[in-house]
Amino acid sequence: MAMQHMLGFTIHPATGGGNPYVVIGVGSNRTALAPTNAPDDSYWICIINAKNPRVMVKDWIIKGSDNSKVPPGIDTYMNDPEYIFVVATKTLSTLHVPQGAFFDFLTKYGAGPELQKLEQLNVVYGCGNYGNVSYALTGQCGPRGGGKPNPPSYEKGSIYGGYSALMMMSLMPGPNGAPPYSLCDTYTWTSP
């Protein structure tokens, strides 16, 4: 059986001017998804339709100073396997890496060593030595726990303020080449 056509899937947290964004596809066949006017020192969470990943279903902007709060109503989307989620930062201060309920929420949905690295940077050096960090997390939405394997999630962090934690992956259709799409932790898109 021939490999099914995959879509490029790129997550670009912002490290300066401009918004964080997600690009689905490549070249003239690409679609960019981004928040409207995300402030510096913030998190952007977006929910993408797994049946049509060029459609953003819902998004939230979380100010860095609200780094311990989980957005109300987000679990409705995060527990539904019809969606893919993306978390991307914009010029995040080391002072505002996730804490408390927000840290637990991100961990529940797949955050691990990359986020822990940013947490360690914060507690060891504080916000004076490293001003900003960059972080991206993505995964298939769906229930976690209950004795079943969790849907896959992927993350990337950068401790270098001027360099984004750029993630390049692919979206893979089902075996018949039709949606829903799932994440593929490799850059194996095929040109249309």
Label each region the model flagged:
Residues M1-P192:
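Short acidic-hydrophobic catalytic motif
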